[in-house]
């Protein structure tokens, strides 16, 4: 497989007034994909990719941004040909798709940022939607009685995301050197499944996650310490295929550290990864024949964990 691609573009920045700006751009993408081997063909693809990026400083503390942009996802050449699946003991080969097309989407994005008084932190919220066309998921490419699936274009799909972040210094409780950060992300998506004919989430699409962290500097002791907590919302992290279905679930992931400077500015740092000793699990449902027949043949559950990882580091100039 060989691809030749050209992307001429034009960009213009508009300063509408001291508080408003608008960036516009237009990219023209032309690509030619040539396939040779068991299957020979040459195909051309053209895309216009406009972008409108509007920014408005409502006040020195409040900023708004609105973005509309068209993006194109490039094809993975591996998806054109059959490949060996070393991770599946029951299926040796993943089929390819000679007629695969690039998929594209429109991104509608709104972001608001508020800088807290007395420079103690920032709160931001980002909400956006992606409207996909020629969306790529696995499709049925069976021949005769031999079941097979490959990556293919299945039509339209939509995704919505709300992402809220905070970063705050705890001045109001007399701890100006304590920085607390949070992030909450809520996500949903919808596409029509080519195997079951149902509306479902995108493959490997998580529902969201919650993150919390802090770092406390104590200059008088020449010390700092911190912790980060990351928890993915379980559910919907699923992969659909022609004869099986897989879901992933996992425990929160926690890291912590403490660092001290001594002996001519030498750093002594102790880190702990996976402090909660969490595990990640995969559940797999293997069906006899096509998944639409819902004849369960095998259920498999695998869990693994790395255990806690402790690290002690000494660094400095000697």
Regions found by a protein language model. Name each.
Residues 122, 127-132, 150-239:
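Gram-negative outer-membrane beta-barrel transporters
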Residues 1-23, 43, 55-56, 68, ...:
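Outer-membrane beta-barrel transmembrane domain signature of Gram-negative proteins
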Residues 8-14, 52-56, 110-114, 162-168, ...:
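Residues on the lipid-exposed face of transmembrane beta-strands in outer-membrane beta-barrel proteins
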Residues 233-236, 258-318:
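C-terminal beta-signal and adjacent terminal beta-strands/loops
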Residues 3-38, 45-55, 175-186, 226-232:
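Surface-exposed extracellular loop regions of Gram-negative outer-membrane beta-barrel proteins
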Residues 24-30, 54, 66-70, 112, ...:
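Transmembrane beta-barrel strands of outer-membrane/channel proteins
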Residues 17-21, 57-61, 105, 116-119, ...:
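Outer-membrane beta-barrel channels and translocator barrels
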Residues 1-4, 72-131, 142-169, 205-206, ...:
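Outer-membrane beta-barrel signature, preferentially recognizing the C-terminal barrel domain
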């Amino acid at each position: 497989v060989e691809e030749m691609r050209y992307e001429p573009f034009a960009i213009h920045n508009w300063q509408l007034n001291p508080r408003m700006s608008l960036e516009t751009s237009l990219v023209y993408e032309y690509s030619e994909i040539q396939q040779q081997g068991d299957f020979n063909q040459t195909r051309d693809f053209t895309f216009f990719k406009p972008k409108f990026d509007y920014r408005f400083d409502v006040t020195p503390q409040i900023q708004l941004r609105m973005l509309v942009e068209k993006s194109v996802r490039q094809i993975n050449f591996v998806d054109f040909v059959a490949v060996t699946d070393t991770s599946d003991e029951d299926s040796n080969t993943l089929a390819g798709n000679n007629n695969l097309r690039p998929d594209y989407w429109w991104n509608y994005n709104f972001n608001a940022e508020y800088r807290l008084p007395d420079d103690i932190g920032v709160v931001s919220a980002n909400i956006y939607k992606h409207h996909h066309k020629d969306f790529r998921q696995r499709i049925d490419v069976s021949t005769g009685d031999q079941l097979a699936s490959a990556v293919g274009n299945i039509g339209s799909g939509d995704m919505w995301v709300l992402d809220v972040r905070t970063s705050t210094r705890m001045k109001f409780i007399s701890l100006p050197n304590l920085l607390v950060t949070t992030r909450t992300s809520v996500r949903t998506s919808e596409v029509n499944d080519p195997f079951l004919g149902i509306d479902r989430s995108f493959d490997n699409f998580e529902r969201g996650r919650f993150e919390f962290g802090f770092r406390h500097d104590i200059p008088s002791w020449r010390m700092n310490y911190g912790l980060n907590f990351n928890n993915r919302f379980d559910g919907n992290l699923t992969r659909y295929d022609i004869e099986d279905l897989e879901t992933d679930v996992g425990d929160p992931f926690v890291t912590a550290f403490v660092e001290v400077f001594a002996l001519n500015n030498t750093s002594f740092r102790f880190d702990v990864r996976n402090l909660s000793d969490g595990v990640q699990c995969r559940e797999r449902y293997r069906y006899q024949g096509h998944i639409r027949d819902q004849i369960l043949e095998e259920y498999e559950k695998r869990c693994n964990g790395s255990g806690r990882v402790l690290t002690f580091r000494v660094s400095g100039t000697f």
